[in-house]
């Protein structure tokens, strides 16, 4: 059965780096993989070396079209529909957490609804070191806005708390402490805890409650985006 992951998050959450990691892990398992960049503000893959790396791994990349040079002229390509009609093993969506990004995702609401039960994960990538996601109330407000504009229910949160090159194991632990509160208050579980191996090992050595932890190692250099 095709597995679809939608990664949504505000600027600085690290969602684009995670989308890349998930796609590369799927491809490494021999899965037919498609990565769809629906971030209409930060064109992470189209304008960076990341795009070339994706193609080298035989991952199909779909990015926004540029009608001309201005960012305001971005448009969604027809190829987005291939996520739903072609026979992929794994599809990863990288979606901006602002109103524009979430609304773009909402255009495909019925396509997501028509997916087989259990095949879709909608994951809010959270970095509590970013000002817009630093408290329970702010995260709750962000998630409500994402769900309203995308017309999809968030199925899980990803603790991706980091300070880029200044990250320590404390970032993941602080994210864990806050997101367990968010999970208890909202009913949205913590689906993944992500970071470099050294930080994950230190984090797990502190024996966090397994209910709020599922660890995933970054396979490429962590950058907040």
Residue spans of the language-model regions?
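The conserved Walker
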Residues: 11
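Conserved lysine of the Walker
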Residues: 15
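Hydrophobic positions on the alpha1 helix immediately C-terminal to the Walker A/P-loop
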Residues: 18, 22
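N-terminal phosphate/diphosphate-binding loop that engages ATP/GTP or pyrophosphate donors
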Residues: 25-79
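Switch II (G3) loop of P-loop NTPases
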Residues: 64-69, 89-105
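Conserved small/polar residues in nucleotide/adenosyl-binding loops
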Residues: 217-224
């Amino acid at each position: 059965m095709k597995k679809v992951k939608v990664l949504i998050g505000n600027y600085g959450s690290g969602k684009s780096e995670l989308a890349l990691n998930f796609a590369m892990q799927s491809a490494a398992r021999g899965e037919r993989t498609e990565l769809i960049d629906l971030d209409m503000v930060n064109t992470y893959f189209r304008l960076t070396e990341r795009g070339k790396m994706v193609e080298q791994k035989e991952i199909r990349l779909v990015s926004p079209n540029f009608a001309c040079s201005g960012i305001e002229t971005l448009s969604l390509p027809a190829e987005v529909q291939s996520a739903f009609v072609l026979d992929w093993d794994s599809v990863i969506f990288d979606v901006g957490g602002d109103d524009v990004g979430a609304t773009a995702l909402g255009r495909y609401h019925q396509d997501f609804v028509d997916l087989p039960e259990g095949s879709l994960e909608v994951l809010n990538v959270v970095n509590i070191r970013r000002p817009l996601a630093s408290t329970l109330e702010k995260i709750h407000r962000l998630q409500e806005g994402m769900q309203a504009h995308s017309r999809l229910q968030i199925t899980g949160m990803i603790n991706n708390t980091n300070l880029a090159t200044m990250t320590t194991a404390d970032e993941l632990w602080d994210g864990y402490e806050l997101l367990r509160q968010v999970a208890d208050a909202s009913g949205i579980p913590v689906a993944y805890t992500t970071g470099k191996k050294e930080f994950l090992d230190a984090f797990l050595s502190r024996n966090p409650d397994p209910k709020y932890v599922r660890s995933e190692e970054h396979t490429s250099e962590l950058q907040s985006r």
